[in-house]
Amino acid sequence: MAILGITLVALTGVTNEKAADATKDALSSLNNSLIWMIGIAIIISRGLLKTGLGMRIGYLLISLFGKRTLGVGYSLALADLVIGPVTPSNTARGGAIVHPIMKSIALSFDCDPEKGTEGKIGKYLSLVNFHSNVITCLIFITATAPNPLVVELVAKATNSQIQLSWGTWFLAMVVPGLLAMLLMPLVLYFLYPPEIKQTPNATALAKEHLAAMGPMKREEKIMLGIFLVLLLLWAGIPEMLFGVKVDATATTFLGLSLCLLTGVLTWEDALKEKSAWDTIVWFAALVMMANFLNKLGLISWLSDSMQSGIAHMGLGWEAGCALLMLAYLYAHYVFASGTAHVTAMFGAFYGAGLALGAPPMLFALVMASATGIMMSLTHYATGSAPVIYCSNYVTMTEWWKAGFIMSVLEILIFGTVGILWWKVLGYW
């Protein structure tokens, strides 16, 4: 579909009457640095799987904190959080790294949906597995693919006056995000209490897996070092200490180069990471179309129409923007892709909020938060959802109930603690 979209823009001349210029327009977003940052970061994240570092981190945390079911839940959440910054594919992170750990623990307690024993521990851990994945996506730009698209659309809507860097995003989201991560396992524990409360088997199982893995291999140590370098550079530490700024995309290319030079990854590994190349292509198509929808006036027209409708209701910008945010967030019930949802709705809704008089930075962060929160709603809301759901530990009704309750909790957290924190930071 992405290739079809690029082809149609080039052939129809909808953006430019000159054929050559129309083709340039169709391919214009392939030089977008944010797109390459997310694509290359997905390739780097393959190193967590290939070296086994991601699994080791997960089992290590469970061996330390897994004596109780609640502790196992927090360990899974912390594992997702720790590897989140360098895993833009939340499907890979939640579905291919954390979920197998969760399943092995559940099965060690004879918790098997085929036997009707999913309530022992698996239902609770599955929901923690998923919702920790979603909250991690809120905290880091590089934790899921739609986030860079949000950054791009905010910059376009404000004529580049607001450019959310990796560090700015992290600083804004870390306090409300960590609070949400802290409360989430507790809320789910009371919502769907596991039958098994004590889990000494979990720590023993984790230690067995760690023993089987042996001491950290050379590749794991190198991957861990690259991971730390990326975090330091993305967070802007060199600029703070030495006044040397390193571009976020350049940092990502540095990470991939180090992976290739040290042998942690080969170029064959990079080529086999199809999701990265898919992301670059369809992301480029979506960003290109979003840009030209804005340039051709459609987004402005939709924004003005919504602003006019809200103004006729007699609402101030605060209530109007709250209404826009809620409509945008819960519209995700009819979307199976976060990126498609952002492309279709974010620009118009953000523009309408600005037209109502909302502070641009404040509303950007509110809408960015909503973009993450909406992924918690359904079993098809984001890529990791069907992977975890299809393990059959949770019914659809239970999944949707938990998703709605968590969305309300996260809206309250980001709408109170988040907004106050952003005020302290001087973001509005």
What are these regions (language model features)?
Residues 3, 70-75, 126-127, 170-174, ...:
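Hydrophobic alpha-helical transmembrane segments
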Residues 1-37, 157, 161, 167-304, ...:
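Hydrophobic transmembrane alpha-helices of multi-pass small-molecule transporters
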Residues 91-107, 126, 139-158, 201, ...:
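Re-entrant/interfacial helical elements at transmembrane boundaries that shape
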